[in-house]
Structure formats: C-alpha cells, structure tokens
UniProtKB/Swiss-Prot annotation:
Gene Ontology terms describing biological process: L-histidine biosynthetic process
NCBIfam families given in the database record: PRK00951.1-2 (NF002107), PRK00951.2-1 (NF002111), PRK00951.2-4 (NF002114)
Protein location: Cytoplasm
Protein name: Imidazoleglycerol-phosphate dehydratase
A single Gene Ontology CC term: cytoplasm
Organism field: Streptococcus thermophilus (strain ATCC BAA-491 / LMD-9)
InterPro entries, alphabetized: IGPD_sf, ImidazoleglycerolP_deHydtase, ImidazoleglycerP_deHydtase_CS, Ribosomal_Su5_D2-typ_SF
A Pfam family matched in the record: IGPD
Length: 194
C-alpha cells in the first residue's frame, strides 16, 4: 500500500496527517478552518484517496500558519507514499467546471518543485478565509511533494466556485499522475529516476 503518516509540531502548529493513495476512506479533515476543511475534503474525494488531517494552529493570529503547514505536511506525505514513483503515469491534467467557472490543474511529479498560479479572487475573503492562502497552500504542497504544478482559472466570477474548481482539479490531476500504469516499466523518465 502506498501510504504515509506524518506528525509535525512547531510553535505555530501541531499537525497529524495520514494518507493512503490506494484507499478512498476515511476522509476526515479537522483543521479548525471550516472553508479549508471543505476544500481539502473535495481534493481528497476527487483524488480518490484516503486523507485524515488533525491540525491545531495559532488561529488566534490567523489561519496562515495552519493552511501553509498542512500544505507542507501533505506534500511530504505524498512524496513518502509515492516512493520511487515506479510505474506511475507521472503526469496529470484536469479541467473542472463549477457553474460559471472553469479551472485547470496540470502537474508533473518530476522531482522538481514549481508552481504557476494564474487565478485571481475579487474579494480578499471567503467568509473569514483569506483567499491569498489558496496560493500559499498550493505553493507549500508543490514544493514539498516536489512537483511542477500549473493552476489556472480560465473564466469565472464566484470566488467559492474558483477555489472549489482548483482543489477538485488538483485532486483529479493527481489521481491521474499517481495511477500505476501497466504499460510503464520502471520509472517514467529517460533519466531512470524522478
């Protein structure tokens, strides 16, 4: 089974995360940030992976540390669960419509960290959630799993729909990339490693 459990404690956050790429349940996200919990649940469900997250952060400051640190730990868990990446597709792309919004995620589990984030939000807040933290989360995720991640909102107006489209698209693209392909022998790279 491709799985990982990671616990990370700092002065700002305490995070315990378990991930199983070959199971779909359970999915249980408890970060103390309701909107973020919703987005991570969508990510896991559309990525068809089991994800359990318990985070206690300094939410009296704001949710920045919690959101970023969950991205760090999730990236580390994905990297560990994927091991040497033998037999996986490596690449994944997904377009996800959400009413008037169309979002895209395209990624490469290359071992090279890079994020291109082409999405804007008309309001700085979604409820009490800072929309700038969406990019912070994906930056932390991409850099810690060591993947090249491109995210784009092709069109849309509603900020909730934009965010939901990006999280769903990333989950779906990741599922495509991590799927073991019987036609791939060894690692999907001319270098012989990722």
């Amino acid at each position: 089974m491709r799985q990982a459990e990671i616990e990370r404690n700092t002065f700002e956050t305490k995070i315990k995360l378990s991930l199983n790429l070959d199971a779909q349940d359970p999915v249980d996200i408890q970060t103390g940030v309701g909107f973020f919990d919703h987005m991570l649940t969508l990510f896991a469900r559309h990525g068809r992976m089991s994800l359990v997250v318990k985070a206690d952060g300094d939410l009296w400051v704001d949710s920045h540390h919690t959101v970023e640190d969950v991205g760090i730990v999730l990236g580390q868990a994905l990297k560990e669960a994927l091991g040497d990446k033998a037999g996986i597709n490596r690449y994944g792309t997904s377009f996800v419509p959400m009413d008037e919004t169309l979002g895209m995620a395209s990624l490469d589990l290359s071992g090279r960290s890079f994020l291109v984030f082409d999405a804007s939000f008309d309001n700085p807040k979604l409820g009490n959630f800072d929309t700038e933290l969406i990019e912070e989360f994906f930056q932390a995720l991409a850099f810690n799993v060591q993947m090249n991640l491109h995210l784009k909102i092709l069109h849309g107006k509603n900020n909730h729909h934009k965010s939901e489209s990006l999280f769903k698209a990333t989950g779906r693209a990741l599922r495509e990339a991590i799927t073991v392909n019987p036609d791939i022998h060894g690692v999907n790279s001319t270098k012989g490693m990722l």
